[in-house]
Design a protein with these regions (language model features):
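Beta-strand elements within well-structured catalytic alpha/beta cores of enzymes
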Residues: 30-42, 57, 82, 129, ...
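Extracytoplasmic/secreted envelope proteins and their assembly/folding machinery
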Residues: 30, 51-55, 76-80, 122-126, ...
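Bacterial N-terminal signal peptides that target proteins for export
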Residues: 1-10
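A short beta-strand-to-alpha-helix junction
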Residues: 29, 71-72, 116-120
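Bacterial N-terminal signal peptides
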Residues: 9-19
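His/Asp/Glu-rich, glycine-adjacent segments
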Residues: 87-191
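Short, structured active-site-proximal loop/turn typified by the sulfatase FGly-forming signature C/S-X-P-X-R
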Residues: 46-91
Length: 191
């Protein structure tokens, strides 16, 4: 069973990384991955109100039909699971707040703990991208504030609750408007 799970995760990871593997880094049709998470936004909310921009993103890209959360179904464990492909008991972020007998207390409200790479096991997708020479960016994604395996995304923002929705959007648009040699091909964005 573990082999089947690992095989499925490997195929999923390859499917996410494959668009980055291009023979021409300067081609104008290079693909981009923007993984957007709207916390507490049910999968069907976009059908209950007018959401033309989200509809366009879904039409031109991909949208999950549904997700089955990891246990526990909390923000930090699940977002880091999406980034690594691992369950919380394998990547270490088992709750939004927890005690680790070696590292001490972890809390999403403790900026020092959130920025301590020792808490984060596994390899998030931005670390894999950076190791392959692919520029990545992360806006508030769990784990991106810490140097996981000594690596941050090229561009990243520490969590700031007061950051306006417009400034968040402007930052991501700015990243996508950078010159090709500076532009991230992978963006993880927690909204």
């Amino acid at each position: 069973m573990k082999l089947v799970t690992k095989s499925i995760l490997l195929l999923l990871a390859l499917g996410l990384i494959f668009p980055f593997l291009s023979f021409s880094q300067t081609a104008t049709n290079d693909k981009y991955v923007v993984m957007l998470s709207l916390d507490a936004f049910r999968w069907d909310y976009s059908t209950q109100t007018n959401t033309p921009n989200l509809d366009k993103i879904a039409k031109e890209g991909v949208k999950a039909k549904a997700l089955i959360p990891c246990y526990p179904s909390k923000t930090f464990p699940n977002h880091y699971s999406m980034a690594t492909g691992l369950h919380p008991d394998h990547h270490g972020i088992v709750m939004n707040s927890f005690y680790d007998s070696t590292l001490g207390y972890y809390s999403m409200k403790d900026r020092a703990a959130v920025g301590n790479g020792a808490f984060y096991g596994g390899e998030p997708i931005w670390v894999t991208a950076e190791k392959q020479g692919i520029i990545s960016a992360s806006y508030f994604w769990v784990g991106s504030e810490a140097p996981v395996k000594g690596i941050h995304p090229t561009y990243w923002k520490p969590y700031e609750q007061r950051s306006s929705l417009l400034s968040r959007l402007d930052t991501v648009i700015h990243w996508l408007s950078l010159p090709l040699e500076q532009r991230p091909r992978l963006i993880t964005w927690y909204f």
